[in-house]
């Protein structure tokens, strides 16, 4: 298989710049103009060699939001710490790619195509060689991968819970009837309305900073954000309270970062596979098996969470709901924390909810 990484031969700029002084005895001093030409030539070579150092060995593709960039920087830092050649100045380059989901902000995600909105253009850049690896929020990654792309790495998972943010009340339960909660997530909308039918949920898009600004300007009374994102942005001071996973089951793969590359690029596979956190990878695989079985999209409120309990077993909880929250179906499983068993748990849980809900349950 072909490896796409290039390792340029780099001479040390210090070696190039170091010149020996001319001996003073037994020789005629060179004219000053010759000496200047020599210095200029040496300086030019040194600059050229410095430029060679800047040639990146690895290009990371990411969205341009502050959270996406924080995740790309986390990936870069881990690569630099694990591979000395990538710690050289300029060895890793971060390339920002604008996705469909970034361009269309005035419509609900479900109305503009659902899954793949935040990954398609990045995957295309990966396939055409513009970038070498792609950093994704796993909750944005479709259940299928494009041909010739592999995802051999999940970084350690952040906190999966949702944060409640409000300027006047400390929890959803304290909000008066008629209060407006902003959220672009049907998963959050359905669970909020199921527990608190007197509240109103409105579409609320934008990056973390934009949504916090809209909240402070009074567009909504409260909002929910993924605690993982707030932690990665060092913005947890905005959190009013944290919802338990019993009150708000997380999105599939919430808090998990995935790193993808071309399937035939052995060098990149080796780089990023070395960062893989196996416990996270298995949990994400279980949750995505559940999602795949349900054939879920952004039009279907689906939640799921797999984790290792105190005895080392996998516990999985899954949920599907109607967007208005009037119907919520839940299930759970417990079994060995191994890939085959966890894939089976996720699929089996999905089949159960399809059978329970009936074919019409998923036609919204």
What residue ranges belong to the model's regions?
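A conserved helix-loop-strand patch within extracytoplasmic ligand-binding domains
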Residues: 138-139, 147-199, 246
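N-terminal glycine-rich phosphate/adenylate-binding segment common to multiple enzyme folds
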Residues: 108-162, 168
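Low-complexity, intrinsically disordered segments with a bias for serine/threonine
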Residues: 16, 25-29
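Short, well-ordered beta-strand segments
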Residues: 59-61, 95, 134, 152, ...
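Small-molecule-sensing regulatory modules
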Residues: 2-7, 13-15, 22, 34-112, ...
């Amino acid at each position: 298989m072909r490896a796409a990484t290039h390792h340029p031969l780099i001479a040390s700029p210090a070696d190039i710049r170091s010149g020996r002084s001319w001996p003073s005895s037994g020789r005629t001093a060179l004219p000053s103009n010759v000496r200047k030409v020599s210095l200029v030539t040496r300086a030019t070579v040194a600059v050229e060699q410095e430029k060679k150092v800047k040639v990146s060995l690895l290009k990371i593709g990411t969205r341009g939001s502050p959270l996406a960039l924080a995740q790309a920087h986390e990936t870069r830092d881990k690569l630099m710490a694990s591979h000395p050649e990538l710690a050289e100045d300029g060895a890793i380059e971060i390339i920002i790619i604008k996705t469909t989901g970034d361009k269309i902000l005035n419509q609900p995600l479900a109305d503009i195509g659902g899954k793949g909105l935040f990954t398609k253009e990045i995957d295309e850049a990966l396939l055409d060689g513009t970038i070498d690896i792609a950093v994704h929020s796993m909750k944005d990654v479709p259940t299928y991968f494009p041909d010739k792309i592999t995802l051999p790495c999940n970084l350690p998972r952040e906190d999966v819970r949702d944060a409640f943010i409000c300027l006047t009340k400390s929890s959803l339960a304290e909000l008066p009837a008629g209060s407006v909660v902003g959220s672009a997530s049907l998963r959050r909308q359905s669970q909020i309305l199921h527990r608190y039918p007197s509240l109103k949920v409105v579409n609320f898009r934008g990056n973390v900073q934009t949504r916090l600004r809209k909240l402070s300007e009074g567009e909504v009374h409260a909002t929910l954000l993924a605690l993982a994102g707030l932690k990665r942005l060092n913005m947890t001071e905005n959190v009013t309270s944290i919802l338990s996973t019993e009150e708000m089951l997380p999105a599939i793969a919430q808090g998990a970062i995935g790193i993808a590359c071309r399937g035939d690029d052995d060098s990149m596979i080796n780089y990023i596979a070395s960062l893989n956190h196996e416990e996270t990878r298995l949990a994400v695989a279980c949750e995505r098996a559940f999602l795949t079985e349900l054939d879920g999209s952004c039009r279907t409120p689906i939640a799921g969470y797999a984790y290792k309990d105190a005895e080392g077993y996998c516990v999985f909880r899954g949920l599907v709901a109607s967007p208005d929250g009037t119907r919520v179906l839940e299930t759970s499983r417990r079994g060995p924390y191994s890939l085959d068993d966890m894939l089976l748990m996720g699929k089996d849980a999905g089949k159960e909810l399809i059978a329970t809900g009936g074919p019409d349950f998923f036609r919204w």
